[in-house]
Amino acid sequence: LPGGQLKSELGFNTSLNLEAQTLAVSDLVLKALGLQLEGQLNGTAVLGDAAFDGEIRIGEFNPREVIQALGQPVPEVSDPEVLSRAEAALQLAATKDSVSLSNIQLKLDDSTVKGELKVANFAKPAIRFGLHLDQIDVDRYLPPQSEQPPVPHTTAAAAGAQMIPVETLRALDVDGELTIDQLKAAQLRSS
């Protein structure tokens, strides 16, 4: 953070019942870095094996402004109009061992991702997901043509071995599906 400080505002209403071991946080509003997060959270068995559920919404914001507020350079992209609009909404459920995000709706510029994501057993995570992307033009997010470094000539196998940590990937427990309605990359379209 530039200057090592973050200016923020936080507001919420809360109700804690120790006898029933319940927690309710409503009207949650957090403002920082040009973002406004809103939501609510409910908890049960808060003094034991706590479980929480709730929803989170981040209203429309400008990602470029957030990146700059964090003191980071905005990535150089081919289309100066991208990274200008984003918003998010989701429902969550969590325990000490798992988290589940459902009704995910993430928007970035003209693209929307919807779906769900679950992580069970944090000690050895099992990740499950189902995500749907309506459309994306990857070319718009790439560096301008003149700034792309030249690609060295290597075999496909050698290039793949350098880029993908295969042994690390083999140890992962990930199962999911990503569907894309319309994809444009390298000036090619797929639907």
What positions do the PLM features span?
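Membrane-proximal interfacial segments on either side of biological membranes
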Residues: 1-7, 11-28, 33-100, 109-191
